């Protein structure tokens, strides 16, 4: 947070066009990946608690189907839904709204994810944000940076994925392992995605 807040408040400086916007994108995207990685790593721990009557095989099927639903929505929405919306209202607004939907999905999982069907439905809602995350940020970054240094900026942009994964592995993992209610993973994800949506709303549309 100490690094993110200054980035979100930074203004463009003469001689460095797009640099402040790029830093805001990295900060906003980092929040997204804290929430996503928390789900990826700890969903099965939650299923063991929420669906204790299932065998290991059936629980594995529920987990696999949950991720199938998430990725199916993530694969289909960008071309058929998100891009047409982005052409009308802009990529940044579309992305922020998608993350807001993802936040709602995580809140739903935290409150109501007590059966396989409910989990599938809510994972589909979460998939709206996932669809945006795998498609829109790269297009947004490409608009904001010097095209001659695109490779450098994309490499730096990948840090907004890698560093949150380390945060989850080293910090969130310890917290979740000690939490009596594994549903806390969805609370963490909801807060992270809400912060991401708010942060993206502070990014200027080009």
Whereabouts are the PLM-identified features?
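Multi-pass alpha-helical transporter architecture, strongest
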Residues: 7, 167, 187-206
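Pair of pore-lining "gating" transmembrane helices in MFS-fold secondary transporters
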Residues: 21-42, 124
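Loop-to-transmembrane helix entry
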Residues: 52-72
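Loop-to-transmembrane helix entry/capping segments in MFS-fold secondary transporters
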Residues: 60, 145-157
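Helix-to-loop junctions at the C-terminal end of transmembrane segments
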Residues: 77-91
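C-terminal ends and interior cores of transmembrane alpha-helices
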Residues: 100-114
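Intracellular juxtamembrane helix-capping segments at the cytosolic ends
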Residues: 132-146
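A membrane-interface helix-boundary motif in multi-pass transporters
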Residues: 174-194
């Amino acid at each position: 947070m100490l690094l993110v807040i200054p980035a979100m408040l930074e203004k463009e400086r003469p001689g460095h066009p797009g640099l402040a916007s790029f830093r805001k994108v990295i900060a906003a995207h980092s929040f997204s990946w804290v929430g996503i990685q928390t789900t990826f790593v700890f969903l099965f721990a939650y299923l063991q608690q929420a669906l204790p009557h299932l065998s290991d095989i059936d629980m594995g099927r529920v987990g696999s189907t949950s991720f199938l639903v998430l990725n199916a929505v993530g694969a289909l929405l960008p071309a058929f839904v998100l891009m047409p919306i982005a052409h009308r209202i802009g990529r940044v607004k579309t992305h922020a709204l998608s993350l807001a939907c993802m936040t709602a999905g995580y809140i739903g999982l935290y409150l109501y994810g007590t059966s396989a069907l409910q989990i599938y439905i809510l994972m589909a809602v979460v998939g709206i944000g996932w669809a945006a995350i795998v498609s829109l940020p790269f297009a947004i970054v490409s608009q904001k940076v010097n095209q001659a240094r695109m490779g450098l900026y994309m490499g730096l942009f990948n840090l907004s994925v890698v560093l949150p994964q380390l945060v989850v592995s080293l910090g969130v993992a310890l917290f979740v392992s000690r939490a009596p209610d594994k549903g806390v993973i969805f609370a963490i994800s909801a807060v992270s995605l809400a912060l991401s949506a708010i942060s993206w709303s502070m990014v200027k549309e080009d």
